[in-house]
């Protein structure tokens, strides 16, 4: 009888990718995935530590799992093995056992390949096992190739870690130093997902445009080199990558938007603030003028490119004038979509030790103002698409039986009513007939 594996994933696309790899890793050991936590023999929470709220979600979920375990015990059933993985595991380590002693395993992002051994030890009644080693090479070398098809769009991790040490961010401490997979590993995985039906690949990394992987004849490939190499794969229609840092947007990568049709005209390029003072305090290593220059060069290379970004409001020391600089940057760049958050002090980061923290009510006010501007820009961009014809990659069924959903080159969701379901997995011309804040509606041509 097969054993059941339940994985709940929090946070970034890298965590989504890691969860798939953990699933693939445990399958040969008899663990089949389930979406029903109540029947699981192993429960893995793949966690996020980027903000306090995200981290506390882990403990809330663990509390619910404890109640489930208690119910199973009363019914005479065996308890599930509980695993905390991801960035909360890396950041908090033994503290997780202190707060939630019923957790069996704590494993960091670079140590997933040891899960089968760790789980087997728990089966043999060992408890409170922890593995937080930072050995990126071992992770990439030992995690399995894809077993379950990812679908029409696939994630491939090509780079992990961060050397930037922004003063608000825990990633260098939870994911380690920057490390790039070798080109052959990435290419082989890309061939695998395309042969399984993927039309689009998203390359992932904490600083993906810092990629510098070893290729044939020991040549070092940049991200631009890697994208050009992958673009040669037959039946691969679209390439994307995330997340990027402005200082790693080199000329070769910018120019590629004008020469490689498979590279989609959409870029997520976090800036975090529009104030030079705050950018310096964040240790972002660039100023607003540098960011504007990148945007201008991207638009010269690909006039229809659409930008996305991340913003943090209420970083320590942020004045009204600093916040106005952020609003000014947003209005000058004009984004297609964005993510914005209140600053959340993370333990162990320089920002958390500053004495000039911004009151919560001011952070909330600024976030509301910023989000109103960003939502207005997003709606304006979506509305500008009405009447146009776009190539849409249909990748999933809608909520209703008579609906399918795809995405444009600009990452907008497009809903089609009464479609031919054979369109799933294909790229089709769609006339956009209606726009809302978060999606488009269209008709097949």
Curated annotation (Swiss-Prot):
| Cofactor list | [4Fe-4S] cluster
Among the Pfam families in the record, one is Radical_SAM
Chain ranges of the MTTase N-terminal domain: 3-124
Catalyzed reactions: N(6)-dimethylallyladenosine(37) in tRNA + (sulfur carrier)-SH + AH2 + 2 S-adenosyl-L-methionine = 2-methylsulfanyl-N(6)-dimethylallyladenosine(37) in tRNA + (sulfur carrier)-H + 5'-deoxyadenosine + L-methionine + A + S-adenosyl-L-homocysteine + 2 H(+)
SMART domains (alphabetical): Elp3 (SM00729)
**Cofactor binding comment, as recorded:** Binds 2 [4Fe-4S] clusters. One cluster is coordinated with 3 cysteines and an exchangeable S-adenosyl-L-methionine.
Boundaries of every TRAM domain copy: 383-445
Q: Where is the Radical SAM core domain?
A: 148-380
Q: Recorded E.C. number(s)?
A: 2.8.4.3
> Its Gene Ontology molecular function terms?
4 iron, 4 sulfur cluster binding; metal ion binding; N6-isopentenyladenosine methylthiotransferase activity
The entry's localization annotation reads: Cytoplasm
Annotated [4Fe-4S] cluster 2 binding lies at 162, 166, 169
Which keywords appear in this protein's UniProt record, sorted alphabetically? 4Fe-4S, Cytoplasm, Iron, Iron-sulfur, Metal-binding, S-adenosyl-L-methionine, Transferase, tRNA processing
Judging by the UniProt lineage, the source's domain of life is Bacteria
Question: Which Gene Ontology cellular component annotation is one that this UniProt entry carries?
Answer: cytosol
Binding residue positions for [4Fe-4S] cluster 1? 12, 48, 87
Give a short account of what the protein does: Catalyzes the methylthiolation of N6-(dimethylallyl)adenosine (i(6)A), leading to the formation of 2-methylthio-N6-(dimethylallyl)adenosine (ms(2)i(6)A) at position 37 in tRNAs that read codons beginning with uridine.
By sequence similarity, the record places it as follows:
Belongs to the methylthiotransferase family. MiaB subfamily.
Task: Give the HAMAP family listed for this entry.
Answer: tRNA_metthiotr_MiaB
Quaternary organization = Monomer.
Protein name according to UniProt: tRNA-2-methylthio-N(6)-dimethylallyladenosine synthase
Could you tell me which species this protein originates from?
Rickettsia conorii (strain ATCC VR-613 / Malish 7)
Its gene?
miaB
């Amino acid at each position: 009888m097969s054993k059941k594996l339940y994985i709940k994933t929090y946070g970034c696309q890298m965590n989504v990718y890691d969860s798939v790899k953990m699933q693939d890793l445990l399958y040969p050991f008899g663990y089949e995935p389930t979406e029903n936590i109540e029947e699981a023999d192993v429960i893995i929470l793949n966690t996020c530590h980027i903000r306090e709220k995200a981290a506390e979600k882990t403990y809330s979920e663990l509390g619910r799992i404890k109640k489930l375990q208690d119910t199973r015990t009363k019914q005479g059933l065996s308890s599930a093995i509980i695993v905390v993985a991801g960035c909360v595991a890396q950041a908090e380590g033994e503290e997780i056992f202190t707060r939630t002693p019923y957790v069996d395993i704590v494993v960091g992002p670079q140590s997933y390949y040891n899960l089968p051994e760790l789980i087997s030890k728990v089966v043999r009644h060992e408890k409170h096992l922890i593995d937080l080693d930072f050995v990126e090479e071992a992770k990439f070398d030992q995690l399995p190739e894809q077993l379950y098809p990812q679908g029409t769009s696939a994630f491939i991790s090509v780079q992990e870690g961060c050397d930037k040490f922004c003063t608000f961010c825990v990633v260098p401490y939870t994911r380690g130093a920057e490390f790039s997979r070798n080109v052959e590993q990435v290419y082989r995985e890309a061939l695998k997902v395309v042969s399984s039906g993927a039309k689009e690949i998203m390359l992932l990394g904490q600083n993906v445009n810092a990629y510098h992987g070893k290729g044939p004849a020991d040549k070092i490939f940049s991200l631009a080199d890697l994208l050009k190499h992958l673009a040669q794969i037959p039946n691969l229609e679209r390439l994307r990558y995330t997340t990027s840092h402005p200082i790693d947007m080199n000329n070769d990568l910018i120019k590629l938007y004008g020469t490689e049709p498979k590279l989609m005209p959409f870029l997520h390029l976090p800036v975090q603030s529009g104030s030079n003072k705050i950018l310096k305090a964040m240790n972002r290593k660039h100023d607003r003028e540098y960011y504007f220059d990148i945007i201008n060069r991207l638009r010269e290379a690909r006039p229809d490119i659409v930008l996305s970004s991340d913003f943090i409001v209420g970083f320590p020391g942020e004045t009204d004038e600093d916040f106005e600089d952020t609003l000014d940057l947003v209005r000058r760049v004009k984004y297609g979509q964005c993510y914005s958050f209140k600053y959340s002090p993370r333990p162990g980061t320089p920002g958390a030790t500053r004495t000039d923290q911004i009151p919560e009510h001011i952070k909330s006010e600024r976030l509301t103002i910023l989000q109103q501007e960003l939502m207005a820009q997003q709606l304006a961009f979506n509305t500008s698409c009405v009447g146009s014809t776009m190539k849409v990659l249909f990748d999933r069924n809608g909520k209703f039986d008579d609906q399918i959903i795809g995405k444009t080159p600009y990452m907008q969701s497009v809903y089609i009513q009464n479609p031919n379901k054979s369109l799933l997995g294909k790229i089709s011309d769609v006339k956009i007939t209606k726009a809302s804040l978060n999606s488009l509606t269209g008709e097949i041509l």
